[in-house]
Amino acid sequence: MKRRRNKKQGWRWLIAFVILFALASGIPGKASSTTTTSSPSAQTLVAKVNSLVENLSYRSRSSSTSGSSTMVTPSKQKAEAVLTANVKQQLGSSITWNGDGAFIINNNKAKLNAKINNAPYAVDRLDSQGRAWQGDAWLNKTTRQYKNRSETGNGATSWRPVGFMQLTNLKNGPTHAYDRGHLLGYALVGGLSGFNASESNPKNIATQTAWANEARSTDSTGQNYYEGLVRKALDRGKQVRYRVTDIYDGNNLVPSGAHIEAKSKDGSLQFNVFVPNVQNNITINYATGKATATN
């Protein structure tokens, strides 16, 4: 416990140092008015500090919840178990294992139009059976959210999506089975006025395994890994078309996985992947959501 507390304090000091350094770098000295134009504006400086603090804070939080020691990458056999004929038909003919938990779809080329000039938007849709189905968005830096959920009134609630039959005290991987899995991530759309980015939006939340939701390393590519690519692009001022479609097999309550596509307007970012809704230490009855430990 003491070691964990010291680690948290270390992160706080590091974040404080970053803020002080950024502020010091952005304050012009005794230079003429012609040189101050090259100094970062207050707005730009604040944005950079927010980005740095958000990234550092996220790493601190993730060290105890989604570290490499618990985010065990599912095997290819485990991941392929959800690729039924029906699921494959929805994804298309080009489905390739990436070796790190997910599948590359259509040679990683997204079927999205990013050459648009609309204001940022985000829409969430239910399917014909009332299940969380698709989130579609046009994102830029203004849609980013750097504050935590409690600060914006989007904290945890007792609401649960269908099929959310939690299983805890698991071993050899994440200690719990399920998260409230978002389609459009809070950090990506939480700054967009009018969009419900809470954890109780039935159009944007489905039952998702802890691994599929949280895994974020290059050798364990859950949804959070791909969201991280989009976050970084937005922080660099890119405009990104982004779409997440939950893929269901028949009438199942729990999705087989998330089909995630992204494409920036300038073409610097593009991916088309399927993150299977699996976890190495459980088996799932997707029709009901009942999970069984396989320790």
Question: Which residues does each PLM region occupy?
Answer:
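N-terminal Lys/Arg-rich, disordered targeting/topogenic segments
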Residues: 1-9
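Sec-dependent N-terminal signal peptides of Gram-positive bacterial secreted proteins and lipoproteins
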Residues: 8-32
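Membrane-embedded alpha-helical bundles that constitute the cytochrome b-like, heme-associated redox core
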Residues: 13, 69-85, 157, 221, ...
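Hydrophobic single-pass membrane-insertion segments
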Residues: 26-36, 260-263
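N-terminal, intrinsically disordered, polar/charged segments of Gram-positive cell-envelope systems
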Residues: 31-110
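N-terminal post-signal-peptidase region of extra-cytosolic proteins
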Residues: 108-109, 114-123, 163
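Domain-level detector of nuclease and nuclease-like folds
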Residues: 116, 127-295
